[in-house]
């Protein structure tokens, strides 16, 4: 289909936007405002609330009273994949777009999604994920998340050109693809998006990353919260690796390898201190170099000081979480 024909058809496509939310009173209004302000106005917006104890529900209900395109649905199982699985059977749109409650997108985002998916060439499309920081540490974390030293070759964090990829953040899919694949796997409450994208690719379809569709995403603002987040990510990845071994890429094994090296170094340090140092020296060198390169782009000393601990927290927490998930699952499997 030509670009002109696709553009002419844009207004004919109802799009379902799914917004999982839990205690997001600080950000839900910004999220809904950006969706309602899209150039493509043929929308339904399903907000899936996982049992918020703050004002999230009241805020969404107010939006729903003012605009019938907004609907509030309950997500009693609370997780992200459960929210998506509650939403897609309700969806009336030809395309389903996930936008989390702590994210915002530019006004042409939905229009660009429709333009890409209406060609029929893609099983899904997504944009570059730009972390946003509100504190000096938060801005350092955002810089790390936008650097290959932090996220390796995960192009959706730092891509500048469109490309076919193995994973898209906050993905948008034809609803027929979602129905065919049966939605998201609720046994992987973390990393469920990667697992779904793997099945999309296994079905013979391709995924497009368009960095022009930038997603502003509120990153963690403290090292402690970042470490907790990446430990969960590591556990989630281990579940996907066990379920789909062929989905594993080299970048997924880098952090677990570093953690294994540190564990071995600690074990042999009393007897072989030099060998112990040799085991971890390569990582420490890369950590120092990467921190210096990322920090050089930041304006304040406070931001620059937070880069090294942010990088280390991401790598080591992810690796620890991966081993916890992998070895914990192995223990459970043997006990059965």
Per-segment meaning from a language model:
Residues 1-36:
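N-proximal low-complexity "stem/linker" segments adjacent to membrane-targeting elements
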Residues 13-16, 44, 195:
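Cell-envelope/extracellular polymer assembly enzymes that use nucleotide-activated donors
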Residues 49-58, 77, 100-106:
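A conserved acidic beta->alpha catalytic loop
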Residues 75-91, 112, 165-168:
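Glycine-rich, basic loop-to-helix element that forms the pyrophosphate-binding segment
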Residues 96:
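Short aromatic/hydrophobic "clamp" motif used to bind/position activated sugar donors
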Residues 107-139, 214, 218:
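Conserved donor NDP-sugar-binding/catalytic core segment of glycosyltransferases
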Residues 185-248:
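Catalytic donor/gating beta->alpha subdomain of glycosyltransferases that bind UDP-sugars
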Residues 258-332:
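Membrane-embedded multi-pass helical conduit in multi-pass membrane proteins
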């Amino acid at each position: 289909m030509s670009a002109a024909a696709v553009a002419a058809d844009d207004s004919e496509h109802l799009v379902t936007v799914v917004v999982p939310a839990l205690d997001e009173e600080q950000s839900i209004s910004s999220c809904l405002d950006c969706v309602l302000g899209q150039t493509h106005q043929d929308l339904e917006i399903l907000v899936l609330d996982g049992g918020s104890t703050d004002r999230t529900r009241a805020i969404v209900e107010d939006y729903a009273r003012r605009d019938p395109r907004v609907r509030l649905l309950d997500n009693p199982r609370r997780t992200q994949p459960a929210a998506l699985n509650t939403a897609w059977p309700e969806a009336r749109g030809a395309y389903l777009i996930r936008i989390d409650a702590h994210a915002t997108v530019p006004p042409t985002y939905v229009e660009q999604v429709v333009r890409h998916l209406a060609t029929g060439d893609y099983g899904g499309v997504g944009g570059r994920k730009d972390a946003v920081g509100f504190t000096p540490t938060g801005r350092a974390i955002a810089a790390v998340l936008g650097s290959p030293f932090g996220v390796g070759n995960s192009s959706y964090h730092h891509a500048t050109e469109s490309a076919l990829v193995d994973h898209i953040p906050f993905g948008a899919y034809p609803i027929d693809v979602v129905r065919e694949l049966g939605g998201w796997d609720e046994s992987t409450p973390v990393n469920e998006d990667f697992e779904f994208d793997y099945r999309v690719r296994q079905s013979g379809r391709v995924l497009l990353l368009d960095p022009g569709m930038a997603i502003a995403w509120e990153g963690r603002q403290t090292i402690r919260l970042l470490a907790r987040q990446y430990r969960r990510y590591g556990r989630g990845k281990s579940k996907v690796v066990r379920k789909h071994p062929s989905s594993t890429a080299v970048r997924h094994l880098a952090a677990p390898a570093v953690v294994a090296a540190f564990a071995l170094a600690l074990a042999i340090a009393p007897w072989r201190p030099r060998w112990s140092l040799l085991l971890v020296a390569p990582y420490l060198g890369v950590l120092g170099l990467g921190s210096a390169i990322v920090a050089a782009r930041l304006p304040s000393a406070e931001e620059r000081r937070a880069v090294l601990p942010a990088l280390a927290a991401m790598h080591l927490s992810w690796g620890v979480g991966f081993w916890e998930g992998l070895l914990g699952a192995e223990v459970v499997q043997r006990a059965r």
